[in-house]
């Protein structure tokens, strides 16, 4: 156990050296954006009612890290879940559809989990949730995956996402291209 704690503390130390650090407890927000990547598109719709959970080590919340050390929680998923417990969002939304961590987040406080597709899917580039078997693209199934709403480009892509335990899949086209006026 001591070896695990030491490895975790060493990893945190090196992350802190490379990351921006936040010391205060996360504040309550109605919406939590999971992963800063592509969040600028979501921010246009959300105004100031959101916060961002940084998932690529660009920013680390020391308050959450300390809480997790005290509780002997050492994984990234546990860090994310603890962060969510403090923010208490009604909605967790992401524009990153190929991060398995999003699908594995615990559902507490009756929040809704929403995923918006931002790119085309391919098992060549998205090996985290897609696989290619005998020339056929399939979704990596996991009983623990869960998401309430997935907004996809079209019904064909929607068929792939059905296997991610989504309650509802909605076709909206590309949210990025919807920012441009047709001439």
Roles of regions detected by a PLM:
Residues 183:
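Donor-nucleotide binding loops and adjacent catalytic segments primarily
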Residues 4-180:
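Active-site and donor-binding regions of nucleotide-sugar-utilizing enzymes
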């Amino acid at each position: 156990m001591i070896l695990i704690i030491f490895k975790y503390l060493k990893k945190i130390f090196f992350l802190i050296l490379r990351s921006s650090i936040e010391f205060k407890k996360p504040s309550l927000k109605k919406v939590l954006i999971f992963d800063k990547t592509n969040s600028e598109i979501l921010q246009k719709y959300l105004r100031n009612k959101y916060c961002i959970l940084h998932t690529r080590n660009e920013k680390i919340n020391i308050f959450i890290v300390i809480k997790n050390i005290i509780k002997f929680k050492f994984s990234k998923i546990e860090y994310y879940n603890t962060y969510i417990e403090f923010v208490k969002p009604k909605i967790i939304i992401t524009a990153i559809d190929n991060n398995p961590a999003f699908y594995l987040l615990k559902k507490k406080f009756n929040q809704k989990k929403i995923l918006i597709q931002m790119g085309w899917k391919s098992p060549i580039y998205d090996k985290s949730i897609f696989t290619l078997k005998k020339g056929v693209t399939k979704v990596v199934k996991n009983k623990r995956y869960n998401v309430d709403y997935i907004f996809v480009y079209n019904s064909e892509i929607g068929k792939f996402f059905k296997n991610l335990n989504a309650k509802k899949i909605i076709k909206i086209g590309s949210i990025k291209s919807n920012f441009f006026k047709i001439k």
